Regions:
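Charged DNA-binding/catalytic regions of mobile-element recombinases
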Residues: 1-179
């Protein structure tokens, strides 16, 4: 199933705006988002350290966009871990294929329709990405835009400090958590 038009499944909002996580791979957030209406970007963020742990790009909103992102994310978890994966009610997150991919590996959660506050952490990430990466630049190709986002993700994960983590980057916080 590549072209999807209608959400067939709506999951309950398990996070209910509780964006805290006491362990890595406990709660993940994602959103299906359009940048410049020509490049689709689908990131997955771990709420424990605010690290973008998986992502994918596509030029069309096909299921393969979120499938690859989810496969990357699930490859990081240990056998007994079963994260909550919270998203908006985007069409691709309501497909039968998405629900099947999560079975036995993750628990699905969805924001209420049209309520950006139910997924505020990823919305904030997109706002930061736009202000630090897009607003002052003009991109001449999809490849240039994608390369810039990928470079920014390295910076965001490895160098961009978070006050909530006492001046550590997401990767530094994860390393400290695991030590």
């Amino acid at each position: 199933m590549e072209n999807v038009e209608k959400t067939s499944h709506i999951a309950p909002n398990l996070l209910n705006r509780d964006f805290t996580a006491t362990a890595l791979n406990q709660k993940w957030v994602t959103e299906f988002h359009v940048g410049q209406e020509t490049l689709y970007f689908s990131p997955l963020m771990d709420l424990a350290n605010r690290e973008s742990i998986a992502y994918n790009f596509a030029i069309r909103p096909k299921f393969s966009l979120v499938k690859k992102m989810l496969e990357q994310g699930l490859s990081r978890i240990k056998p007994k871990e079963c994260p909550i994966i919270h998203s908006d009610q985007g069409v691709l997150y309501g497909t039968e294929e998405w629900v099947k991919m999560l079975e036995g590996k993750a628990v699905q959660s969805m924001s209420r329709r049209g309520n950006c506050y139910d997924n505020t952490v990823i919305e904030s990430f997109f706002a930061i990405l736009k202000s630090e990466c897009f607003y002052s630049r003009t991109y001449h190709s999809i490849a240039e835009l994608q390369a810039e986002i990928e470079e920014y993700l390295v910076y965001y994960n490895q160098k961009r400090i978070k006050l909530v983590f006492k001046g550590l980057s997401p990767v530094q916080y994860r390393a400290q958590y695991l030590s």
